[in-house]
Amino acid sequence: MKTLRALSLVLLGSAVLTFSFGALAQSPANDQLHTPAKGSPERKAILDAVREEYKEGADHPAEFKVNYLKVHNGWAWIDVTPLDASGKQVADPAPLLFYSENGKWTAKDLNDVSTDTDGHEGPHDPSPKYIKALQKKYPGVPIDIIPKKHK
């Protein structure tokens, strides 16, 4: 009986440690640059936030083709193309920046960041100058989520 009780305590302790390490590995402090997998809860939450943003300026719902998505330390940069129900493009591709606060993804205004005067298209083709202005406006934005500038 003592052996069974000791074994139960060992198994319970192992389960607690496994859960603790799993939760620690997923904590924001240990977040690594990644692209959430299709169908993952994180990707769904980000796309739901994109839909909310899109709804404010459109008269019809849309689905989105994800052209680019990177997440790191609670920040997400996503570039999407809005599509109608038949899969036809209904608007130009759009880059968006989101920050996760209290489990909710909130859009940050990329148009409010001072734009380049050297011919680049701000968030559509972020230059080093634009990225510097973005990080000044939104301290903490990891540079590794921002798409590389086109040449």
Describe the function of each predicted region.
Residues 62-65, 89-95:
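Short, surface-exposed coil-to-beta transition loops
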Residues 70, 80-84, 93-96, 109-114:
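A mature extracytoplasmic/lumenal domain signature
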Residues 1-11:
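Bacterial N-terminal signal peptides that target proteins for export
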Residues 54-66:
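A short, amphipathic edge element
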Residues 26-39, 43, 47-48, 53-55, ...:
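Low-complexity, intrinsically disordered terminal/linker segments enriched in charged
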Residues 94-104, 129-130:
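Short beta-strand segments and strand-loop junctions that repeat across beta-rich extracellular domains
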